[in-house]
């Protein structure tokens, strides 16, 4: 160990962000407060299970109530546009930070509370040489439309902020790629690791999984993404554990490629699901419009309970075929329908037909085209990879997914054909019915109908026989026929005019069946590479560092030390003066401690007073700042303070090459060193005594938040 000469405090650089000296209070109590890494936004989780998003001036943007779900953890993504929230029952919700709307909800894979969430972003170099497969045709397609909102369900793609999912990608061929890893941890260890938040590359699906490590209290990832370093509680001690995935190190480009395709296609499949759900809602409006129209006839029939009448459809058919209406039909047309009722029904039907046409032409078909392009690219990659001997995709599974997508497209075109015909025939029917109403109410009926009525009488008959109150469109939504791949009879467009009564819902594959089949086919495509990735995880290190499980940890792998892959870890017990700094380095696929220091804060020396005896300050909380300094929230008697310690001023003791189980003894024998130098120190007034702190290191500024859980108050500061 080499002793160092300490310096007195430098110029004070601590300042409150809120210049009005205002301390914010949350009445229901503070459970968790985190800062956005890219914008000056705060996410607050209250004890009453409310998630509040605020600006740095504490102005509320939105407030979400989770009701009976008990939230346990939350995390921002790097761009600050999404917040992921974990719950006690194991569920996850991803929230749009601009609106507070739900983006995605994921059920719990196991009934354990979410303890930790890390959403890491690394900019890595992917050595991709297959430039022929990097061309992205979807980048030159128009952006997809934003779905209308719904009262029945919360749609992801009703939010304009989520339109970024389908923005054209940057220029292809760039080697630098930003790779995101979303990790969810519970008391057994890592539940799963997703690349780009949705593509699963690791899951603890069995008790023998390498991801089952114990209760995690810290999780760090190396820059090449291949090593995950965790500090866990287990039994009666604290351990340093290393996970290694060779595939991430040796063939990162292939996984990033597949994960990127999977994520984009998953968004498109979800988009299609929401569009089809919207079409079901719109068709429900068609059904309700028809039901309300026919209800006027049924109400009239109920007055004549002693007389037998045909249905409205048959009454109209009999009238148009022989030109003589029954007394009941004449009474219904004269007294119950009228011009106003007919116009309202026509307007409702035309609006629904128009909405369904727009959904098909401007939403479903363009999304299917994009998905076809991506699936074709995936098929090419799988064939190329098979030739090279390192494929992670099965070409046959991709072809099956393309076939399912082809069925959906065929169904949509057939549905559009049917929809256009029914809309046209309905207008002819209404023209004929308007003519009949006029004829019934005139004193001198015309002997010959107008030429327009005569020319379209066949279409009117078809509409009454096959569509009125029993729309052929129903079969596309209520069909019960199972999907059979490579069915040659399915690829012929159904002719609306030639359909007869023998065609029933049993002869149609519904949109719902196709939607579920597409989702299943898509999941099968990427399940094989995902399973391959999950089996690659190896636990290469498990070292006991401390006895007891009441240690708090702050650790990180600084970006400035990426080449060395060093892990800086601070261990402390709350309300005690002891602080341990342990620096570990990756050696032979295992993170091993190489140096450490056991120190405490000499409060008297930190203040620059030589008159006071050594007075060790107790630690309330501390955070590492990118491998260069430490923020320490401390307390001495009634005084509470915050200071920044430079890591260069911390004297280190280097460990000799130890056996794996002897680090515990080496760390426990580190001598205690009083530290009497800091970069700055700030004492707090008695009206606000914080107990914990959070910080965010952004490109523009460094800022943090001090939290007093006892008084449910918080305040932002910069440094």
Curated annotation (Swiss-Prot):
Which Gene Ontology CC terms are recorded?
anaphase-promoting complex; cell division site; cytosol; mitotic spindle pole body; nuclear periphery; nucleus
The source's domain of life comes to Eukaryota
Q: Which Cys pairs are S-S linked? A: none
Q: Does the keyword Cell cycle apply?
A: yes
* Record keywords, A-Z: Cell cycle, Cell division, Mitosis, Ubl conjugation pathway, WD repeat
Q: Which InterPro entries match?
A: APC4 (IPR024789), Apc4-like_WD40_dom (IPR024977), Apc4_C_schizosaccharomycetes (IPR056357), APC4_long_dom (IPR024790), WD40/YVTN_repeat-like_dom_sf (IPR015943), WD40_repeat_dom_sf (IPR036322)
Pfam families for the chain: ANAPC4, ANAPC4_WD40, WD40_Apc4_C_fungal
Segments annotated as WD repeats: 57-96
GO aspect biological process, one term: cell division
**Tell me, how does this one assemble?**
The APC/C is composed of at least 13 subunits: apc1, apc2, nuc2, apc4, apc5, cut9, apc8, apc10, apc11, hcn1, apc13, apc14 and apc15. Interacts with apc1 and dim1.
Q: Its biological function?
A: Component of the anaphase-promoting complex/cyclosome (APC/C), a cell cycle-regulated E3 ubiquitin-protein ligase complex that controls progression through mitosis and the G1 phase of the cell cycle. The APC/C is thought to confer substrate specificity and, in the presence of ubiquitin-conjugating E2 enzymes, it catalyzes the formation of protein-ubiquitin conjugates that are subsequently degraded by the 26S proteasome. Has a role in promoting metaphase to anaphase transition via the ubiquitination of specific mitotic substrates.
The name this protein carries in UniProt is Anaphase-promoting complex subunit 4
